[in-house]
Amino acid sequence: MNTKKLKAAIIERGYNIGQFAEIIEMDRSKLYRRLSRNGNTFTIAEVLAIKAKLDLSPAEVVDIFLP
């Protein structure tokens, strides 16, 4: 997973990490932990929520979430 690209996508859309955590209904500390572990613990449901809330294209999802 490319956490730098995910963080960039969040910021490009005008959110900070804390705001985005609220939007995807995730505890802020949990999102920070996931990002600090290179996202290796995101569930499929969480990835889908992130995709939807950031309006990521299929190519962006692949680029961010797949090695």
Language-model features: locations:
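A short, Lys/Arg-rich alpha-helix, primarily the initiator
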Residues: 1-15, 23
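Key DNA-contacting residues within the recognition helix of helix-turn-helix
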Residues: 7, 32-33, 62
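Residue-level detection of the helix-turn-helix DNA-binding "recognition helix"
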Residues: 11, 22, 36-37, 66
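The DNA-contacting recognition helix of HTH DNA-binding domains
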Residues: 17, 28-29, 58
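Short alpha-helical "recognition helix" segments of helix-turn-helix
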Residues: 19-21, 50
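Recognition helix of helix-turn-helix/homeodomain-like DNA-binding domains
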Residues: 26-41
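DNA major-groove recognition helix of helix-turn-helix/homeodomain DNA-binding modules
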Residues: 45-60
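Short amphipathic recognition helices of helix-turn-helix/homeodomain-type DNA-binding modules
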Residues: 60-67
